[in-house]
């Protein structure tokens, strides 16, 4: 359900843990292609990635497969993207040239495979069966279904009001709005 404070709660939780945006975690909001999701997973391979309303990857078989690899239950997961792409290089091509591999990464390329030890959080308003029809992603995840009734939603909004902009506005005025 939209408007339930999912994004706010995730961001607050990350900050409360002392994590720093764009260093310890990154929030990707809106659209993301499969190859860019893969690239972000490489860049944050030991950190936390939050995909907020990036629902298109659920409809793409390659996106779902990369997610399944990233969400596997092993501590370290091997993720690969072995399709032709100008953004991907084969690490085997640089076995004798570590500096060349470093330069490829510095130039924005990503290896065709890498070990992932990070965490992924997806925030979506999609129905769980629509986002994950076969249940493969859910079987590798913790799903928190946020679909409160109207009374619970109003209670949640009242809890969040003091923290919402403009913070200097009186609480009674925010409640009236």
What is the meaning of each model-derived region?
Residues 1-10:
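Walker A/P-loop nucleotide-binding motif
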Residues 3-4, 31-34, 54-57, 126-130, ...:
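Conserved nucleotide-binding/hydrolysis micro-motifs of P-loop NTPases
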Residues 4, 16-48, 55-61:
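AAA+/P-loop NTPase substrate/partner-engagement loops
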Residues 9-13, 40, 62-70, 136, ...:
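Alpha-helical scaffold elements adjacent to nucleotide-binding pockets in ATP/GTP-utilizing enzyme cores
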Residues 23, 116-118, 131-154:
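A short helix-turn-beta junction within AAA+ P-loop NTPase domains corresponding to the substrate/partner-engaging
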Residues 45-49, 77, 112-122:
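Loop/turn-to-beta-strand initiation segments
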Residues 59-116:
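Conserved catalytic/switch belt of AAA+ P-loop NTPases
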Residues 154-177:
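Conserved AAA+ ATPase small/helical "lid" subdomain
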